[in-house]
Amino acid sequence: MSGQMFWGKKEDGKRKRSFQESYETPKVQKCVRKRRPALNVQGQPLPPQRSLEMMSKDQLMSVLMEVMRQHPEVGSTFQAKVSSYQFASEKYQQLLKGKVEQLYSNIPYNRSYDNTNLDDYAFVRMKPYITELLNCLVDCALDNLPPRKSDLHESLKFLESCTQLVLDLPRFESGSNNYYYDKCLEQISHLWCSLIEQISKDIHMVMNTNMEEWITKLNAYNERSNGLLTSAVTLFKSLASDGDLLGDQQNEMESPAYVAGPGLLLESNPSYLMHNKYSM
């Protein structure tokens, strides 16, 4: 009896141990993370190409002008590259139109833009826009003269539009405040004389240009400018007279009785070429 009880207790102990072992909580292995190198990424400016794509026209112009001031050799290289470009007449007109609009927008509110009696206060306010417009106009006019432009008819039309633009600008009560306008008209007169000089060297241009029409236009502009374009009018009249003489001699050349001479040379007029840019 005692032996049975002994063995029974033994078996009960084994059962308890096996039961406990079967239901023991499994050991959880700790997950150790490997340390990664820290990512130290910092912002950086756009490269030049992207910056150029993002910049406005004014920003780009400001940066470019500053670079050329600091490095004159860059300006020389830039000028050499750009001088080979040919722009359409509409581009010049669009540029000048923007300058004119800036000038008109700075006329004081108590004055109308078509008023020819603007006061001193208006002049002080408008002066930087006047000088910017007139300098831009002369730059554009020079770029439309030979040899930059080979079409003399186009040069005539553009120079006429420049002349009319200056004459249409609002004037001031004080004559001294109109100095920049008058000085610019004097320079435009030199440009007219230079262009007429070029026309006089082209026989076909002389023969195919309506001189009387251009003389009439220039006379009207000269009256509005108080005689500042007189030299251009005089030179155009001289060219018209030479053109009439040339036409008579051309008819003689076409007649059967004409005997060819040493060759016809159109007498050159005094040179009015402007060598320096107009500065305010």
Curated annotation (Swiss-Prot):
Keywords: Cytoplasm, Nucleus, Protein transport, Transport. GO terms for biological process: chromosome segregation; nuclear protein quality control by the ubiquitin-proteasome system; proteasome localization; protein transport. It is found in: Cytoplasm; Nucleus. GO terms for molecular function: proteasome binding. GO terms for cellular component: cytoplasm; nuclear membrane. Residues 1-27 are annotated as: Disordered. InterPro entries: Cut8/Sts1_fam (IPR013868), Cut8/Sts1_sf (IPR038422). It comes from the Eukaryota. Its main location: cytoplasm. Disulfide bonds: none annotated. Binds the proteasome. Belongs to the cut8/STS1 family. Involved in ubiquitin-mediated protein degradation. Regulatory factor in the ubiquitin/proteasome pathway that controls the turnover of proteasome substrates. Targets proteasomes to the nucleus and facilitates the degradation of nuclear proteins. This is Tethering factor for nuclear proteasome STS1. The gene is STS1.
